[in-house]
């Protein structure tokens, strides 16, 4: 069943498991919304929803086999400049360990589903809503960029442009969803009700300026 509606998927690292539970239930009911917008971890959920792979996001986020753990130790963090093993998550997982069904993903898009991943363009400081339905490698890079948290992960270059986590520029892209003019919008949040983001401390602001001083705020 394809419903003419938008669904917005907030990020939140492993809190995205909550989102995956909601999407798994929708897939079990064979219910698909026509326009999916994912941010950060939500981008990973979005593509798994379009590929109709029940349980895949959960398996990727909660890995029981230590051999496939994606958290870097201190030594690897210093060497890779990344808290997470992004090669594991966005290369080995989709190609070998938890194979991503790109053909089903592509067919879903051909049948009318629009699947967007939100990234932050580090040159402009603005959100970009990216769509890729033909190039598997590029889709993985877009998901990687959307999930690359500042300070904790390196920038990701796509077509010569550096990108970071989509949540920096548009963490809950409801306004973008409204522009699509669908009658209904479903929003899946991963924070507790009433959550308000705290202001950045002076120390953290200084750290950001040191790391990204040449880029827009």
Predicted region positions:
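Patatin-like phospholipase
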Residues: 1-39, 47-217
């Amino acid at each position: 069943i394809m419903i003419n509606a938008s669904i917005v998927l907030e990020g939140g690292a492993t809190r995205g498991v909550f989102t995956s539970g909601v999407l798994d239930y929708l897939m079990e009911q064979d219910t698909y919304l026509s326009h999916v917008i994912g941010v950060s971890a939500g981008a990973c959920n979005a593509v798994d929803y379009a590929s109709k792979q029940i349980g895949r996001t959960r398996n990727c986020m909660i890995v029981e086999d230590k051999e496939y753990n994606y958290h870097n130790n201190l030594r690897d963090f210093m060497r890779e400049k990344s808290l997470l093993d992004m090669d594991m998550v966005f290369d080995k997982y989709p190609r070998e360990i938890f194979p991503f069904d790109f053909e089903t993903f592509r067919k879903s898009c051909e049948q009318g589903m629009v699947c967007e991943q939100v990234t932050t363009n580090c040159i402009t400081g603005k959100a970009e809503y990216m769509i890729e339905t033909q190039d598997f490698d590029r889709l993985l890079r877009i998901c990687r960029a959307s999930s690359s948290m500042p300070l904790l992960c390196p920038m990701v270059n796509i077509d010569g442009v550096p990108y970071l986590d989509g949540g920096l520029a548009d963490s809950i892209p409801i306004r973008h969803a409204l522009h699509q003019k669908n009658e209904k919008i479903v929003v899946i949040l991963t924070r507790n009700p009433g959550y308000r983001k705290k202001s950045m401390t002076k120390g953290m602001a200084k750290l950001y300026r040191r790391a990204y001083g040449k880029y827009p705020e």
